[in-house]
UniProtKB/Swiss-Prot annotation:
Its cofactor is pyridoxal 5'-phosphate. The active site is at residues 35, 253. Keywords: Isomerase, Pyridoxal phosphate. The modification N6-(pyridoxal phosphate)lysine is found at residue 35. This is Alanine racemase. GO terms for biological process: D-alanine biosynthetic process. Belongs to the alanine racemase family. The lineage of its organism: Bacteria, Pseudomonadati, Pseudomonadota, Gammaproteobacteria, Enterobacterales.
Length: 357
């Protein structure tokens, strides 16, 4: 019998979030970003919940092939492009749109005998300073590619480094506008934060990532109420032991939690080997048990953690414990753990059960 530590993935929540995004950016097509196994939610869940997307954006070629093998016939974007010249065979075979962000990729394209023309997203480094061509080299490369019969279409792609900052976005947009006046390209610019905070960046295509999964990239009560995004992932486990602890006792490894009163505690079968963050405080991190919000006490262990049951009189062996989801925000946990919700979702262990609903 497997351990009960489980992530539940709501395909209905995924579909709802996509509808919300499409309604908000209703003049743009949508690349649903499902890199890193759909931010830990699984490609299978993405296919089920995001059927109405315009296309899927992935990182690795094997994710793109998996989409095709599971029946997706629409557009697929390879966000970092190809890594080897040999990758171009599958890009052509599976009709995948590739990013080009560097001269070495450009040279591979020129050298490779491409039988069927491919779609290319040319990456502009407008200020992120990670991937892409600078302004001058971008224009040169654009003209270079546009003269190749093996290229069927070109799109300008860029990425905002601080999507909620008007100053930063405008600085990058000024560079993009200069190039737009020269080339008049199709544009793909806005990531999740820019989609929400800067509607003028929406253009032809948008690339929502974290917001598809019900998480705002920056906490904002007004925005949260406006969008009403639904959490897609719930991490839950079960109580496997209940202990009555006398006053003036330590709980768990390292004597990190001292109780000066009698305590009813529950041992939950989830730990850092499952992906729950070890770095949360020794008290105060919320969990949800039988309709009651309570807290973790003591250190998170490899396979278990301890919770306070003093205010949960109905808790028993086998009671469900929500660690994040509809009742406990993953953003709240990530702040307490001094990390991000992105990291928490992506680092769920392979030993955790996945249930797609």
């Amino acid at each position: 019998m497997p351990r009960k530590t489980t992530i539940r993935i709501s395909s209905n929540a995924l579909a709802s979030n996509l509808r919300t995004i499409k309604n908000y950016a209703n003049k743009s097509k949508v690349w649903s970003v499902i890199k890193s196994n759909a931010y830990g939610h699984t490609i299978k869940a993405a296919l089920k919940g995001l059927k109405e997307t315009s296309g899927f954006a992935v990182l690795e070629l094997n994710e793109a092939v998996l989409l095709r093998e599971n029946g997706w016939n629409g557009p697929i974007l390879l966000l970092e492009g190809f890594f080897e010249e040999s990758d171009l065979l599958e890009i052509c075979q599976y009709k995948i749109t590739t990013v080009i962000h560097n001269d070495w990729q450009l040279n591979y394209i020129k050298q490779y005998d491409i039988k069927s023309p491919i779609d290319v997203y040319l990456k502009l480094n407008s200020g992120m300073n990670r991937l892409g061509f600078n302004e001058k080299d971008f224009i040169r490369t654009w003209y270079d590619l546009s003269n190749l019969k093996k290229i069927s279409s070109l799109t300008l792609m860029s990425h905002f480094s601080l999507g909620f900052s008007t100053k930063t976005v405008n600085k990058q947009m000024n560079i993009i506008r200069k190039i737009f006046k020269i080339l008049n390209p199709t544009l793909c610019l806005a990531n999740s934060t820019a989609i929400i905070f800067h509607t003028y960046t929406h253009k032809d295509w948008i690339r929502p990532g974290i917001i598809l999964y019900g998480i705002l990239p920056k906490e904002n009560k007004k925005i949260s109420k406006k969008f009403n995004l639904k959490p897609v992932m719930t991490l839950e486990s079960r109580i496997i032991s209940i202990q009555n602890i006398k006053s003036k006792e330590y709980i768990g490894y390292g004597k990190n939690y001292y109780s000066n009163k009698s305590n009813l505690i529950g041992i939950v079968s989830c730990g850092y080997a499952d992906g729950y963050p070890f770095s949360v405080p020794f008290s105060g991190t919320p969990v949800f048990v039988n309709g009651t919000r309570t807290q973790i006490i003591g250190s998170v262990c490899m396979d278990m953690l301890t919770i306070d049951l003093n205010d949960c009189p109905n808790a028993k062996i086998g009671s469900k414990v929500e660690l994040w989801g509809n009742n406990i925000s993953i953003n709240e946990i990530s702040k307490l753990a001094n990390t991000t919700s992105y990291e928490l979702m992506c680092r769920i262990s392979s030993r955790v059960l996945v249930k797609i609903e």
